[in-house]
């Protein structure tokens, strides 16, 4: 069995520059970038940088994109995704000298989910226009799998720099993860 495909995005930005942008934007920026559920967690530099890394992972801002395409969730990422994210975070920490101590799982929907599905699907299975949730092939029991897109991110700040790392992957229900 082959390993699942993932998309990777990294954002490295000067912390002062990011804090100034968030400070200038205030509540309007918070509403623009973060969903209502996320605003209760705080929509500061973390939300902006992590969402920038998620945007990079899906290949940019597709037509119809909104910042709300990505939403932090309380559920943990897929069990197989956690070690992959940890390893990538360790590599990035080694190269930047900055440990990535924060983390969260994300729901991916809308235009960004469709863009990710197109990039993650095998070329022979990729529909011309994939919906955010698409019926996939059958699971071993014969029931169709639901293909949704999920993500996980890690971040850290220090030495005047803010770093975030995100992976985006298919979360297929009705199929055991490798």
What annotation goes with each model-predicted range?
Residues 1-178:
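Core catalytic alpha/beta fold that binds nucleotide/phospho-ligands
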């Amino acid at each position: 069995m082959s390993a699942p495909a993932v998309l990777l995005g990294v954002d490295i930005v000067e912390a002062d520059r990011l804090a100034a942008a968030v400070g200038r934007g205030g509540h309007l920026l918070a509403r623009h970038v973060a969903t209502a559920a996320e605003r209760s967690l705080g929509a500061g530099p973390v939300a902006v940088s992590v969402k920038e890394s998620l945007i990079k992972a899906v290949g940019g801002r597709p037509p119809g994109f909104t910042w709300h395409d990505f939403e932090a969730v309380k559920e943990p990422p897929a069990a197989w995704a956690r070690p992959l994210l940890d390893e990538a975070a360790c590599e990035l920490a080694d190269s930047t000298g900055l440990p990535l101590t924060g983390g969260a799982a994300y729901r991916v929907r809308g235009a960004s989910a469709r863009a990710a599905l197109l990039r993650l699907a095998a070329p022979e299975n990729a529909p011309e226009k994939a919906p955010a949730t698409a019926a996939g092939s059958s699971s071993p029991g014969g029931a169709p799998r639901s293909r949704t897109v999920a993500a996980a991110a890690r971040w850290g700040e220090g030495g005047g720099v803010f770093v975030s790392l995100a992976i985006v992957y298919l979360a297929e229900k009705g199929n055991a993860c490798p």
